[in-house]
Amino acid sequence: MRPPALTPRLLLRAYALGIFPMAESRDDPEIHWIDPRHRGIFPLDEFHISRSLARRIRRMDWRVGVNEDFAATVEACADREETWINPTIFRLYVELHALGHAHSLEVREGETLVGGVYGVTLGRAFFGESMFSRRTDASKVALAFLIDRLRAGGFTLFDTQFLTPHLASLGAIEIRRSDYHQRLTEALAGNASFTPEGYWADPASVVQRNSQTS
């Protein structure tokens, strides 16, 4: 029997079950479904902005935007020697973006895209998919602005899928699968907005709000 066609709706159903897709490589057409025993998450009130990163944010001449060029952000995340983003995954996330369930946050130097992150939203959960950096600290800046936005929008779960040393240094932790599924169930029971009404994120405010919550 042929497996069901992979569609954005099927992808959202998988996220609701705590499963996410990956390919072995850019050229591998097969999609693998992942449900790790241990899951990386960012507690939204424990993101760590170091003094040096705070100075970088306050003094930066970069511009931060959201959903300005989702496809370019995903392409930039895939622009590395090894990537799990194959053409099928790229297409699916672009379609999810068109449906309002996938979002990007971009960091620009002038008109040049120098950093960013993208992910999927469902209920009060944000599933971080990938990020990239073409300037020192650009991905850290993207995360700082992203977490500030998630807090303001009412999100309660930021799923990073896996825990890396880079994410751990910024406050991410690893939890057991059972704990993750409980948090996911709670997050799916509510609603949040990636573009909350009246939200404004200038650099000084992002640093100040983080210091009040972390």
Curated annotation (Swiss-Prot):
GO cellular component, one term: cytoplasm
UniProtKB keywords: Acyltransferase, Cytoplasm, Transferase
UniProt xrefs under InterPro entries: Acyl_CoA_acyltransferase, Leu/Phe-tRNA_Trfase, Leu/Phe-tRNA_Trfase_C
One Pfam family this sequence matches: Leu_Phe_trans
EC number(s) per entry: 2.3.2.6
UniProt keyword annotation of Cytoplasm present: yes
Location, primary (coarse class): cytoplasm
Record flagged with keyword Transferase: yes
A GO term, aspect molecular function: leucyl-tRNA--protein transferase activity
Biological process terms in GO annotation: protein catabolic process
Localization annotation: Cytoplasm
HAMAP family xrefs: Leu_Phe_trans (MF_00688)
Name listed for the protein in its UniProt record: Leucyl/phenylalanyl-tRNA--protein transferase
UniProt source species: Cereibacter sphaeroides (strain KD131 / KCTC 12085)
